[in-house]
Regions:
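Anionic group-transfer/hydrolysis microenvironments
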Residues: 180-181, 403, 412, 467
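Short connector loops/turns at beta-strand edges and beta->alpha or beta->beta junctions
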Residues: 95-96, 414-417
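Mg2+-dependent endonuclease catalytic cores in nucleic-acid-processing enzymes, primarily RNase H-like
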Residues: 114-118, 122, 265, 269-278, ...
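Hydrophobic, well-ordered secondary-structure elements that form the walls
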Residues: 401, 462, 590
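Mixed-charge, glycine-rich, non-catalytic linkers/tails in nucleic-acid processing enzymes
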Residues: 604-614
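Extracellular low-complexity, Gly/Ser/Thr-rich intrinsically disordered linkers
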Residues: 322, 326, 334-338, 358, ...
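Phosphate/NTP-binding elements of NTP-utilizing enzymes
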Residues: 2-400, 407, 439-460, 479-481
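A generic structural motif
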Residues: 149, 412-414
Length: 641
């Protein structure tokens, strides 16, 4: 029987096609695959180029990619590459292990941005992934902002974490959460995000849940809660280059005999003091090649996340659930000098101190519950203003609080570093929906204030609360005075939410209804109340009050300090909430709204308070130097001598 060459070639083609479905690549760990394939795109990386796993990332990534570890929690600071690790492991799951994957981010906007700036460029820059994406760069049902379906049949979803519907109808092998601490505690009264999300992997042969976040407030932080449910909490231990003793790096403080130490006011002098033998260690001396993660609860350890050992050194099965902690001191993307500089910037500012603890140390912040400023002490902090608008004020904003029988407005002046001065207090009595009352509010909005040189300043931006009244009243006033000048607002009591989140588009009522992070604003304001100016020296963040009983008195001070943080159980969860205890707090609310108006001006219109003040002072100087004929006559007659 003769077979032609063309028949042989056709047979070879069909045999290969039939066997192709049986082909499996040689197994690789997540780190092996990432080092061989992963590429950091220019859109979402400080430095574009091929991925190279760092020593402290090795065990974390391999644990994420392991089929034997069901839950991985990562409690971390900023600048350790968590999102990049997560995305690299997801690419590994899709291309190498052929798994269905899903990741949630705190909001729909976060998810959309992550898909555009991280996921899509990563698909483009990894050839093996791009080969599975014939739809790349095209409109296609398998290529949307929430889902990518690859030609190997595997799907990847990227969704916001606020809506309960985003936790339904998906059957995946891998569920991931980026910045878990920023998620709502209870998703539309249906449960915690990890409880809802992990339901999506219950039918998988190899279920995997990956959670990571910079932590927030102790006792209410979701990544802290997830970590506490894991039996293993791993910290990265490195040997001292001088005595050889292992330890994990600690920031330390004045009372701690080890950790980062430096000469006062000289960050460049920083070194690490070994906790075992007081050896002086410089950052460049540490070698992380053989460093290992050790559990502070059980003593088990691993170097690579593949092989695990008991505290006595015997090899054991990988744990079902594990938590890793890593912080900035280990990162080559930062320096110990910069850590010290950042720490020094937090002096006297509790808000900055909390940010440092969360984002640099990767630790939860322990809130001081029940403390509030002393109103009587604050009431004595009156100052003589040189004019209705003090010299260092560059910009005026106002906040309006709505009540059924009145409107209350406070005008605040702002200088460089957000130093602030209370400029005016207006209480407009009358029915909230009466036009005559609203006309008097109009007058207050359009009132001008005088600088020392006689120049008039108007209120540049006003945030007006819609709570408790018909919001269309505020909407119409916004249209009357200017959509960008009078901005309707509503409060959002969510920890960590920006002071102001102004939308890019108008709502269906034709206005820019803006959410205010009231908790964040109040915390910042209370921190600033602790700053005490010395004489007339500028002090960023300091708050000033006029020696004018029509504007500032004990009642105003009491309202500014009316609220305190309290612990409450809400739907079975402990939360830290701001509570006025039924004390009047209109002055504080107005301050919050005025601060929000300033932040909108900075974020949306790039307001630069320092540059604006310099410009105003030039105008003040020019006005001061202008002389009238009468001035010259007095000078010539000797009257000015």
């Amino acid at each position: 029987m003769n077979i032609s060459n063309s028949q042989v070639n056709r047979l070879r083609h069909f045999v290969r096609a039939g066997l192709r479905s049986l082909f499996r690549p040689e197994p690789q760990t997540a780190v092996e695959w990432a080092d061989a394939n992963y590429y950091l795109p220019k859109e979402s990386a400080y430095q574009e180029g091929r991925w190279e796993t760092l020593p402290f990332q090795r065990a974390i990534m391999n644990a994420m990619g392991s089929d034997y570890i069901r839950e991985v929690n990562v409690v971390k600071s900023a600048r350790v590459g968590y999102s990049k690790m997560l995305l690299g492991v997801y690419a590994y799951f899709i291309e190498h292990k052929q798994r269905n994957t899903l990741i949630w981010l705190p909001t729909d906007g976060d998810a959309e941005n992550f898909m555009k700036t991280h996921v899509e460029p990563t698909i483009r820059d990894i050839p093996s992934l791009l080969a599975l994406a014939p739809w790349y760069g095209k409109k296609h049902r398998d290529n949307t902002l929430t889902m990518k379906r690859f030609s190997n049949g595997r799907g990847f979803w990227c969704l916001g974490g606020k809506a309960a519907k985003n936790y339904r109808e998906k059957s995946v092998d891998v569920a991931g959460y980026d910045e878990l601490a920023a998620f709502d505690d209870d998703i539309e009264q249906e449960g915690s995000p990890t409880f809802l999300g992990d339901k999506r992997i219950e039918g998988s042969v190899w279920p995997k849940s990956i959670r990571g976040s910079t932590p927030k407030v102790r006792g209410t932080c979701q990544i802290e809660r997830a970590a506490s449910e894991s039996p293993h909490f791993m910290r990265f231990h490195v040997a001292c280059p001088h005595c050889g003793e292992e330890q994990y790096l600690k920031f330390g403080d004045k009372e701690t005999p080890f950790g980062l130490k430096w000469t006062p006011d000289d960050p460049s002098s920083v070194f690490y003091l070994c906790e075992h033998n007081a050896c002086v260690i410089r950052q460049q001396e540490l070698d992380f090649t053989d460093a290992r993660y050790i559990c502070e609860k059980t003593g088990i350890w691993t170097r690579d996340g593949i092989l695990w050992f008991s505290s006595s050194g015997e090899e054991i099965e990988p744990p079902d659930s594990v938590t890793f902690h890593i912080w900035t001191a280990y990162s080559p993307f930062s320096t110990w000098v910069q850590i010290v500089k950042d720490w020094m910037k937090t002096k006297g500012d509790t808000g900055k101190r909390k940010t440092f603890v969360n984002t640099t140390l990767g630790e939860t912040w322990e809130a001081k519950i029940g403390e509030r400023p002393d109103a009587e002490v604050m009431a004595e902090r009156k100052e003589h203003y040189s004019a209705p608008v003090p010299d260092r004020v560059a910009y005026l904003t106002a906040g309006i609080d709505s009540q059924l029988d009145r409107y209350e407005m406070r005008v605040w002046g702002w200088g460089p570093g957000e130093e602030s001065w209370l400029i005016d207090r207006q209480i407009i009595m009358g029915r909230h929906d009466d036009e005559q009352t609203l006309l008097r509010v109009d007058e207050a909005i359009n009132k001008t204030y005088t600088r020392r040189n006689g120049a008039e300043m108007s209120i540049s931006r006003i945030c007006w609360d819609i709570g408790g009244i018909d919001p269309t009243i505020v909407y119409e006033r916004s249209k009357k005075h200017g959509l960008f000048r009078v901005i309707p607002i509503k409060g959002a009591s969510v920890y960590g939410k920006p002071v102001a989140s102004m939308p890019r588009k108008r709502n269906k009522n034709g206005v820019y209804l803006t959410e205010i992070g009231t908790d964040t604003a109040k915390e910042q304001i209370y921190n600033r109340f602790t700053l005490t100016p010395e004489g007339d020296e500028p002090l960023p963040g300091a708050v000033h009050f006029p020696n004018n009983p029509d504007i500032f008195d004990l009642t105003e001070a009491q309202q500014l300090t009316a609220e305190e943080q309290v612990e409450k159980w809400v739907d079975g969860r402990k939360k830290i909430l701001w509570d006025s205890k039924k004390r009047r707090n209109e002055a504080l609310d107005c301050f919050v709204y005025a601060l929000a108006a300033l932040r909108i001006s900075i974020s949306r219109w790039q307001l630069d308070l320092s540059a604006l003040l310099a410009s105003l002072q030039e105008e003040d100087g020019a006005a001061t130097n202008k002389k009238t004929l009468a001035d010259y006559a007095r000078a010539l007659s000797g009257e000015d001598e």
